[in-house]
Amino acid sequence: MAVRIRLSKRGRRKLALYDIVVSDSRSPRDGKFIQKLGTYNPNTNPATVVLNDELTFDWVMKGALPTDTARTILSERGVMLKKHLQVGVDKGAITQEVADQKFSAWVSNKEASKTSNANALVSKKEADRKARLAAEVKIKEAKAEQVRAKKIVAENPVAAADLAEATDAPAEAAE
């Protein structure tokens, strides 16, 4: 029996959630499965993956083949690297201690990368918010200046003529 690790769709249209499952390759996408390994939510930024890594690793070592999307998710979580290292240990190319050391180094590097990416995303959002706020303040100041000029014109026609000359003078100097 050919066993696949794949995504099983659930949720609703335009807001799909996926279960990461082990199933027979001949069964339909949302049909019967052997075991549920976790969930995948692509609607969040970054995508949320809840996965039982040890159980998934056991299935991969037993010969379950992941689909392309499932392989990407498993690679992101380190299951495929762990399999690669374990195959090296089984063949005698490296020792278990070296494999564990390489895997833990990869995990720490991955965590640092995730943290820096999350911080960059937060700082970008903050910078965008500040830029929008500054643009809004400029627009409000311009509107307030227009309202003030209209009040002056309505209250005192002589001052309005002086105001018109004051605004025309900088325009003429610029030309």
UniProtKB/Swiss-Prot annotation:
GO molecular-function term, one example from the UniProt record: structural constituent of ribosome
Record's GO cellular component terms: cytoplasm; small ribosomal subunit
One Pfam match: Ribosomal_S16
Any one of the GO BP annotations: translation
Keyword hit for Ribosomal protein: yes
InterPro entries the record matches: Ribosomal_bS16, Ribosomal_bS16_dom_sf
Keywords per UniProt: Ribonucleoprotein, Ribosomal protein
Domain of life: Bacteria
Keyword Ribosomal protein: yes
PANTHER family registered for this protein in UniProt: 30S RIBOSOMAL PROTEIN S16, SMALL RIBOSOMAL SUBUNIT PROTEIN BS16M
Similarity section: Belongs to the bacterial ribosomal protein bS16 family.
This protein's name: Small ribosomal subunit protein bS16
Organism of derivation: Cytophaga hutchinsonii (strain ATCC 33406 / DSM 1761 / CIP 103989 / NBRC 15051 / NCIMB 9469 / D465)
